[in-house]
From Swiss-Prot:
Catalytic activity, as annotated: chorismate = 4-hydroxybenzoate + pyruvate
Enzyme Commission numbers on file: 4.1.3.40
Pathway per the UniProt entry: Cofactor biosynthesis; ubiquinone biosynthesis
Homology family: Belongs to the UbiC family.
High-level lineage: Bacteria, Pseudomonadati, Pseudomonadota, Alphaproteobacteria, Hyphomicrobiales
Alphabetically ordered keywords of this record: Cytoplasm, Lyase, Pyruvate, Ubiquinone biosynthesis
Name of the protein in its database record: Probable chorismate pyruvate-lyase
Stretches that traverse the bilayer: none
S-S pairs: none
PANTHER family for this protein: CHORISMATE PYRUVATE-LYASE
Binding site for substrate: 37, 79, 117, 158
Amino acid sequence: MISDLRSSILPPLKWLSDQDPPVPAGVSDWLMELGSMTRRFENHCTCIRIEPQRECFITRDNLKEEAAHLPNSTCYWLREVILMGDNQPWLLGRTVIPQETLFEHNEALINLGTVPLGRYLFSSGNLTRDYIYIGRQGALWARRSRLRLAGKPLLLTELFLAASPLYTTNSI
């Protein structure tokens, strides 16, 4: 079923360029994390919980600027979640997956439900990352990564909310 996507849980983000001031080192350490953000968050709480907000198929017309980061596809799986650390909202996550990426062994991605995306991705053994872009939404930091599972792309955008340990801890 294709959803008529009216709005995202993510507010509009401003992606940084080389002309923007440098990102503070402690923040950059979090945003440039190459491993599982879920695992990193687990170092700062006793309980990680995912609250799915939207899980559905969408068309390319719903991608907006994300379309430039993904190949043409008949449809895309969209997953938007709130990641909670000890019952505090820490992160808004938006994952867009071309239908072709779901073929073969990755169809489990559409049934993650309350399972953190990182638990699936980083247990696959076939994960690579093409890039990380850093962005802002007011005082909040964000990042966008194009990842590949067995060479097939998916796009992950994460907005770190005010209660996130990114703002309250030194790099750990």
